[in-house]
Amino acid sequence: MKAGIVGLPNVGKSTLFNCLSNAKAQSANFPFCTIEPNIGVVNVPDTRLQTLEELVKPERVLPATVEIVDIAGLVKGASKGEGLGNQFLANIRETDAILHVLRCFDNNNIVHVDGSVNPIRDKETIDIELQLKDLETVEKKLEKVGRAARTGNKEAIKEKEVLDGVKNALEQSKNIRSLELKEEERLEYVKPLQLITDKPVLYVCNVDEAAAKTGNAYVDQVKEAVVGESAGLLILAVSIEADINELDSFEERQMFLEDLGLDEAGAAKLIRAAYSLLNQQTYFTAGEKEVRAWTIPVGTSAPQAAGVIHTDFEKGFIRAEVISYEDYENYGSEAKVKEAGKMRVEGKEYIVQNGDVMHFRFNV
């Protein structure tokens, strides 16, 4: 599960990446300081995991993770290979979701690549480059499909019809994630193309300290611009996150946040938002040796969830013993949950719920 941080040079994305991963990507005030994509594996903040640790007292605890990639800065003309364009577009294609950082603050000491602060223009600059790259991909596919359609192949005719609609949308500067398509059309004809503008996106509005809680006029412009785009939006003061990163203890960080009137670090909110953006949820396994959070897509069946641990678990699945997280917390132990008759035995058809504590029975 991989999310890529993108944005024009000097919008704060490498600083944000540093805050998320504590990996010290070179954060300089000039374009292209991130030439190779920096990759960080980031723990997903989850208070339920802490509670299970306190109740079970295991030897170790393993949280769910998201891979965050800081992708090299983009400029106009990237789709034609300008700047680091080709590399940027190859790196972003490999991600599952996009975290698009927009500069929503004024600061004369930080140069803007286009000379002035305008988050809508910045968004459009990146959108256009991604749309042009997607258009290139779709046109190549249409050449092939068009030849088959001309022979009267019904499947090819249907595919051409869908892809013509996709091409038309891109030519009108529309992102494919907001294009209305039947689910089967999207799955069969669009998903295999791995179009960049079809990936889920979270717009991260990088504001100054004064706007950290409620946003500002720049954020309002972005909110208006992304209506109907099936996108998420998060307000974040990257400079505050950088300051928090310098504090050693949890207590110091909490005091710092309270002084600013914030309930938690923006980085934690962002990681959870990325997790949600990817339509992921968590189930837990809890034993003396290990308490662990496992990542699965929403709608996963019990055998598929077992397969995340090991493929043998899925192949030989017999049943799952399931405790809801709420029951585990309320009763305080697996034994007490069993006594209360709250442990359920579920079969192959069971759809795992967010927060389920599970134990699998299987046959190899």
Where do the PLM segments sit?
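C-terminal-of-GTPase-core extension/linker across diverse P-loop GTPases
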Residues: 2-6, 11, 17, 144-351, ...
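Amphipathic alpha-helical transducer elements in NTP-driven molecular machines
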Residues: 32, 46-49, 62-68, 82-95, ...
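Short amphipathic alpha-helical segments
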Residues: 28-29, 110-114, 215-217, 247
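Conserved G1/Walker A P-loop phosphate-binding module
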Residues: 1-111, 139-140, 145
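Short, intrinsically disordered, mixed-charge
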Residues: 22, 54, 90, 94, ...
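Conserved Switch II/interswitch segment of TRAFAC-class P-loop GTPases
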Residues: 40-45, 72-82, 93-154, 169-183, ...
